[in-house]
Every structure is written in structure tokens, then in C-alpha cells.
Amino acid sequence: MIWVAVVITMLLFILVAKPTGIYLEKAFQGSKKLDKVFGPFEKLIFKITGVKEYNQTWKQYALSLVLLNGFMIVVVYFIFRLQGVLPLNPAHIEGMEPTLAFNTAISFMTDTNLQHYSGENGLSYLSQLIGITFLMFAAPATTLALVMAFIRGLAGKELGNFFVDFTRALTRVFLPIAFVTALVFVALGVPQTLDGAVTAQTIDGVKQSIVRGPVASFVSIKELGNNGGGFFGTNSTHPFENPGQMSNILQMMLMMLLPTALPFTYGRMVGNKKQGRILFVSLFMVFLLGFITITTSELNGNPALNAMGIEHVQGSTEGKEVRFGTVFSSLYATVTTAAETGAVNTMHDTLTPIGGLVPLVNMMLNTVYGGVGAGFVNIIMYAIIAVFISGLMVGRTPEFLGKKIEGKEMKLIAVTILFHPLLILGFSALALSTSLGTDAISNLGFHGLTQVVYEYTSSAVNNGSGFEGLGDATTFWNITTGLVMFLGRYFSLVTMLAVAASLKEKTVVPETVGTFRTDNGLFGGIFIGTIVIVGALTFFPMLVLGPIAEFLTLK
């Protein structure tokens, strides 16, 4: 039965992707029906905020994005610092320490949701609602807006206006879907209240304080926006965030909903639906490979414990919730790192070496399918690299969507693709070279190295999950991961928007017999190969020194 449930879940991922992709295209391309429903409210927002609906250049678009996000970071930072004297604080939680507030504000504005605090004990209700939940809407709306401008540029159209796209992302996508799914989560047993903790008496006669709060509304946007941060410190392992298998499947569907829809949106917007389907299928094959790998590893159990004769029929159950089991815990770990969400229903630090390698590789690739918007930008970056390499091999000028890929575009892409490895490996080396970093490691040897690299990888690609054996609630880790999150988020968004703007100005080259097609199985294979060769091999030495070496040691 468990495998039937897995297949049904996978089919649900596939079935909802195309309709959602069609809806996104209509939401941002001026559907008359949607304009009638949402238009009056949006125009009121534009009037109050003074937004004028005009087409921006790529520099204006990028500057608007960065400035608005920067302003939000500052506002939320002060909410965290002052929460002790602000209302909606029934637990009387004190203001955050400066570096932790810095880290947390950047974490949620960049859609990372890395948490160096425990949710129920570190934030007041005001901070959870006005600070965290607000950014959980604003962060994915930012990148969904940007990816629409990015696709318009690839299609040779005007980029649009950031503030208009940002507003539409909120009013037409995130608010309505999050509202409906929050009600579903309430029906499934997730609490939604502004009352404080309650005191219960256990069967042993001991009094226990049970924390609750506006959890359902938090969880819906947490998953839909690929945010991933937990209302509670234990995230989606907590029964109030994820009561059972139905809520577990719904959370995975929400995580995959927008990332899997964007290839179809892209295909419709650029006038090549088949290319969108090829991208979707190619990435789903990589996703399946990751799921099969992690599930096989976890079901085989820990080799060291197996050698001691310990029963392992259920696989490696360390760090997993019994109500989800090994298979669905493995699927959740694959989904949350493929969609760059970072929510967890099992502790990733307790995964087997190869089991832990899959989430790490998913994040390093940042394309399968990646987070809302930002992941799809990376997908197209790899697609352009695949076209460029193919063109060089046959001696033709590379073309993508009928436009020549030349030096300017490839220089921007080269800088972008090198930036993330430099961030991840550079800061990992810094942490390993000082006691400020190594003192946080709870496991010596290969696993300790993986803990450090996982933390910076998760920060750079805005995932937010962690190997939580790492003691990262220190000034060093707060500042360094904060910088990595900020740079990892905005650098690639700006450079790839510049690539789209450059292609927008180019004329379409007529298709000939010798044109390399990007909407067939051959391109899909080359695309996957490019991701593996360029993406995975960049980090291969680290993977050998970390999870692979740990696996061989246990064997």
C-alpha cells in the first residue's frame, strides 16, 4: 500500500503542474477574466502606494526588487529586536540578539528560512505574523515576479514593472491559494489561534505547557512559497504542523506546485510548449533518480548497525516519525530539497551517508526544480549552457529560442555559475579554518565536514534545511550564513535578468535544417548531462570527502 500511495502522490505532482502553469501565464499576461476579479483591488493598491504601471528596464526592475527587499529586511529586523515591548506576546519572549535578528530577517526575506532559533520559544505572535508570515508572502512573490520578467525577456517582450508583477503574485497566486489551503490544514487538525499556551496534565500527573498559535496560516504559505521555516523548532515533524499522512502529502504538493508549473508557463509565454514539456520531463527524471537513491539507502538501514545484528526491516528509522515511515520521509526529504523549501519531517542529520547525499546534491544543483522563480532561472541557465556546448561541438553559433548566444550572455552565465560554488566552498573553508566554525561541529571526521558544507549550501541556494547537529546559533554562524544567503539570492537573480534583457534586444534568426532543436528528447538528454557534468562535478571532490567517504567507512 505504501508504494501505491507514493505513486498516487507522484501522479498528483504531475497532474496539477500543467493547469497551474496555464493559470500563472494568464495571471501575469493580462487575462480579462482575472483582471475583472483582481483588477479593482490591485488598482486600489497601486493608487495608495503610488505605483505607476510602466515598463521598466532590467536595471530599474532589478533595483526596484533589491531596494524593496532591503527595506523589508530593515523593518522586520527592528520588529525582531523590539518584540519584547511590542503587543501579541503572551509568552513574554524577549527581543532577539542583534546578529540573530540580522540572520533571521535576511533568512526569511531571501526565502531561505534558515532558523538559528526555536520557533515557539524565539518569536512572539507579532513577530510570527507581521515579521515571518509577511516575509513568507513577500519573498516568493519577489522571485515569481522576477521569473515572469525573465521569461518575457527571453520571448523578446518588454520586461514589465516589478511592483505590478509583485502585487499580482500576491493577489492572484499566494493569497488565494494560501487562504484555501490554510482552511484545509485546520480541517486536518493544524491549530489556528492567537491564544497563548495551555497547561495540560499528563497521564503521569505531570503538568505540561503546550504551545499553540496561528499555525495553519503559517504552514500553508510556508510550503506554497517554498519557504520552509517552522512555527515550531522541530518543523514539520511536530504534530501541530503536520498531524498525519494527509497533511504530509498536501505539504509536498504545495512545495512542488509552482516549481513544476513554471516549465509549462514558460512554454506558453515563449510560444514553444513542447520545450516546456521537455524541461519538465527531464527534471522529473532527475527527481525520480534522487528519490530512488535516498529511499534505497534508507530502507537498507545503517551498515554499522546491520553488522551488529540489529533488526532493520523498516530501514534506518533514526530521526524519523513513525506516522510517516521511512519511504514517505525519504520522499519528503527529496521534495523539500528539490523544490528548495527546507521544511523537514525527518532530521536530515540522521540520514544514512548516501541518504544525506541526495538532499545535498539537490541543493547544489538548484535546478530540480528549484524554488519559486529562482529555480527556474537556474534551469534556463543550464539550458543555455547545454545549447552553447552543443553549438561549439558542431561548429555552429549557439541559438536559444532563435536568438544567438554570444560572448556577453556567456560571460554573465559563467560568472553566475561560478559564484555559488565560490560562496559555498569559500565560506566552508573559512569555517573549517577557525575555532569559531569548528566548535559548532558535533561529529568529527567526514560527517562533520558534511554538516558545515550542508549549512552553507542550504544558505547559498536559499533552502534553509540543515544538519541540525551543527551548533549554529552563534555570532559567527549568524553573520556568515546571513551574508551567504543575501549574496546567493540577489547576485544570480540580477545577472540572469541581465541575460534575458540582452536576448530581448536580439532579432530572431530564421530556423534552418541545421538549427539545434531544444524541444526534443536529444536536447533533454544533453540538458540532463549538462546539469550533471557542470553542476554535480563542481562539488564532486567535496562529496567524496564528505558523505561518500563516510559511506565507505561504514561499509
UniProtKB/Swiss-Prot annotation:
UniProt keyword annotations, A-Z:
Cell membrane, Ion transport, Membrane, Potassium, Potassium transport, Transmembrane, Transmembrane helix, Transport
Q: Reply yes or no: does the keyword Transmembrane apply.
A: yes
- At the top level, the lineage of the source is Bacteria
Compartment(s) where it occurs, according to its Swiss-Prot or TrEMBL record: Cell membrane
- Family annotation (InterPro entries): KdpA
Cystine bridges: which residues?
none
Q: Name one GO molecular function term.
A: P-type potassium transmembrane transporter activity
GO cellular component, alphabetical, reads:
plasma membrane
Instruction: Give TM regions.
Output: 2-22, 60-80, 130-150, 173-193, 246-266, 278-298, 374-394, 412-432, 483-503, 525-545
Q: Pfam families annotated for this entry?
A: KdpA
- Protein's membrane topology: Multi-pass membrane protein
This protein's record includes keyword Cell division:
no
What role is this protein assigned? Part of the high-affinity ATP-driven potassium transport (or Kdp) system, which catalyzes the hydrolysis of ATP coupled with the electrogenic transport of potassium into the cytoplasm. This subunit binds the extracellular potassium ions and delivers the ions to the membrane domain of KdpB through an intramembrane tunnel.
Q: How does it assemble?
A: The system is composed of three essential subunits: KdpA, KdpB and KdpC.
Q: Which family does it belong to?
A: Belongs to the KdpA family.
- Name of this protein: Potassium-transporting ATPase potassium-binding subunit
| Source organism of this protein record | Bacillus cereus (strain AH820)
Gene name in the database record: kdpA
